[in-house]
Amino acid sequence: MNKMLDYLNGYKRECVLAPLFKMLEASFDLFVPLVMADIVNVGIAAHDFHYILMRCGILLLLAIIGLACSLTAQYFSAKASVGYSTALRHALFAHIQTLSFTEMDTLGTSTLITRMTSDLNQVQSGLNLFLRLFLRSPFVVFGAMIMAFTVNVRAALIFVVAIPLLSVVVFGVMVVTRPLYKTVQTRLDRVLGLTRENLTGARVVRAFDKEQTEVNRFEDANALLTKMQLHVGHISALMNPLTYVIINLAIVALLYVGSVQIHVGGMASGDVIALVNYMNQILVELVKLANLIVQVSKALACAGRVQAVLDTKPGMQFPQEVPGEVPAEKQNDAVRFDHVGLTYAGAGAPSLTDISFTAEKGQTIGVIGGTGSGKSSLVSLIPRFYDATEGSVEIFGHPVQDYPREELRGKVSVVMQKAQLFGGTIRSNLLWGNQNASDADLWAALETAQAAEFVHSKPLGLDEPVEQGGRNLSGGQKQRLTIARALVSKPEILILDDSASALDYATDAALRKALAALPGSMTVFIVSQRAASLQHADQILVLDDGHLAGLGTHAELLASCPVYEEIYASQFKKGDARQ
């Protein structure tokens, strides 16, 4: 938690001035009951209208000064809390960018969104309230008690009894509810996760007529959240009635003692009014303090959750130095897997086992296998999205762990299974590949990706707007644009992870032909379910349940690999299976 306080360093002045101005406001408020007592004891008793007007003027002046102090305090507290949450949100987002796929998988997208939004908003609100009330409320409570002693010592003893009782109630509720708020936030994460999952997969839900099932799942999770919120609410709700009971009993005692003191001449009527006002001030401030404690308890629980994300260490460390010379025997190597195994965090079984192969510069490598065979897992090791748990992965003669992040990303471009575009324009999306690319570079990449024709057909061409997620484009258009984006960076290794699944066979064939015709020695990995897309590859890796079932050319695999032969035969006529 101390690390999070570092983000307040730029707002030390505001953190000091906000509570000081609130205490100044409170100081003027403490004089109000004494002025009212004077009005009753002197002005009303003597029927002195001028004296009453003078004292009313003083009350008005105290109110104006108090308002000015309050507004100033609010300005400083808002500046500090908003600035703090902004800095913390930036730091949290920047930290999330350093996390590997492993940490992202472990934490979960919905959890991170909650930390960035709901949790940080709670922290901001809690800090704002804390800066305004953490000194003011105790100051008024103890200040009112001291002022009560200046009025009448015997009556003030009632304050000595009431304040500890009120403190027990307030702090008791705080101790009980603080851990419960953590549970509330955890269950809120679950509800948000289900909501996100449902909205993301809305079309699938409707296609399988599972609307009611999803409603039931949501209602179950929401019921658990509601149950815990009600439990916390019931405990928190005890605070106000208990404090009011104690305060009202104290006021009754004050009136009794005051009446006795007035009867014996120890007090004036105005003094009783002042004491009751002080008791009411204590009541108001303790209610504020109670709300402050509830809000701060929520904020601390949320801050702990944000801190947990900040404390999550990136599982991958990247060196700063570029690796040295390539050994002579590896000069022609692009990618080498040496007895590689991969087991995801929290997974019971390995996704890849004992994978070994070498891809040379300029080769096209096909990767094929059944669903869940480990195709995407294999190619994700090349750009180091994950680290192999066994064996080693090398690119251009050096282990992937020896490359700085920027160097590695510059050498390897990946087109993911899911075509992801960002809100902006076609141009802005393509420039992700290379911010300095010219229009000629962009059009060349679009030509290779078979996307130039449909981009030319758009009224604004490269400047055609793209909605978030590419909602205004078809699946095939999105895939071609993501391929073009990868080509803009002119990588040495291009990975197409089943990224042409939405393309028709003719477009797919044209894409492969265009890739083969590119100048240079770019190594291409094509992950596909279509045997036809891979049969002209220099090598084809056949995966079966995480194992390398076959390695060779199309003809070699048809002759030697039953798994490949079965895949090929299932997609073509049996009579053509050996062709």
Q: How does the language model describe each region?
A:
Residues 1-31, 36, 44-60, 65, ...:
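Membrane-integrated ABC transporters
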Residues 10, 14-27, 38, 59-62, ...:
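Transmembrane helices of ABC transporter permease
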Residues 10-13, 98-102, 118-127, 131, ...:
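An intracellular "coupling" helix at the cytosolic face of ABC transporter transmembrane type-1 domains
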Residues 314-330:
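Pre-NBD coupling/linker segments of ABC/ABC-like ATPases
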Residues 326-579:
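ABC-type nucleotide-binding domain
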